From Swiss-Prot:
SUPFAM superfamilies: 14-3-3 protein. It comes from Spinacia oleracea (Spinach). One of its GO terms (biological process) is signal transduction. Coiled coil: none annotated. This is 14-3-3-like protein. Belongs to the 14-3-3 family. GO terms for cellular component: cytoplasm. Gene3D superfamilies: 14-3-3 domain (1.20.190.20).
Length: 220
């Protein structure tokens, strides 16, 4: 189970990283007006997206037809449903329009199904339950653009795990505490971003009000 997950994660992870780099370069070249460069970069990006789609579709088919139906224990069900959500999320990262909407909806469905089982059958400190909370919160933040829900989910998972930290066995202590640290890091980052955005909005609103005052003065 873990070997399969790591194998696909390595293959898809490398292409996700390449896609991010290429997309960044494409934006820079577009801003500079280098259309010849942009055309070549787009072709390369399309090839990466094709490989990503094929890889994600391959593991999703395996999950739907074999792995999820055959899962019997609670942790196996959560593991494979989380995995299903992950690969739909990877598709949502680069798909557009109706395809992106479909991938996002499939991600949400898989994560929610996994969450229901995890909450009922796995301890708050279980690394698979924590990993699900981590990835689910990232989905809310990055794909659905919902920082409030992302922060609430991550915070709840972290607080619930902290409350039962003394029940952790040695075998899962390292994995669980590592994921908890990632949850806390994301919370710190996202909260900071939200505060920056709020400050920008306040500054913008103040500028508008000042402009209105100035306009009134001019009118008088």
């Amino acid at each position: 189970r873990n070997l399969l997950s790591v194998a696909y994660k390595n293959v898809v992870g490398a292409r996700r990283a390449s896609w991010r780099i290429i997309s960044s370069i494409e934006q820079k070249e577009e801003s500079r007006g280098n259309e010849d460069h942009v055309s070549v970069i787009r072709d390369y990006r399309s090839r990466i997206e094709k490989e990503l789609s094929d890889n994600c579709d391959g593991i999703l088919k395996l999950l739907d037809t074999k792995l999820v139906p055959a899962a019997s224990s609670g942790d196996s069900k959560v593991f494979y449903l989380k995995m299903k959500g992950d690969y739909h999320r990877y598709l949502a990262e680069f798909k557009t329009g109706a395809q992106r909407k479909e991938a996002a909806e499939s991600t949400l469905t898989a994560y929610k199904a996994a969450q229901d089982i995890a909450n009922a059958e796995l301890a708050p400190t279980h690394p698979i339950r924590l990993g699900l909370a981590l990835n689910f919160s990232v989905f809310y933040y990055e794909i659905l653009n919902s920082p409030d829900r992302a922060c609430n989910l991550a915070k709840q998972a972290f607080v619930e795990a902290i409350a039962e930290l003394d029940t952790l066995g040695e075998d899962s202590y390292k994995d669980s505490t590592l994921i908890m640290q990632l949850l806390r890091d994301n919370l710190t980052l996202w909260t900071s971003d939200m505060q920056d955005e709020a400050a920008d909005e306040i500054t913008e609103e103040a500028a508008k009000q000042q402009k209105a005052v100035n306009n009134n003065k001019i009118a008088y």
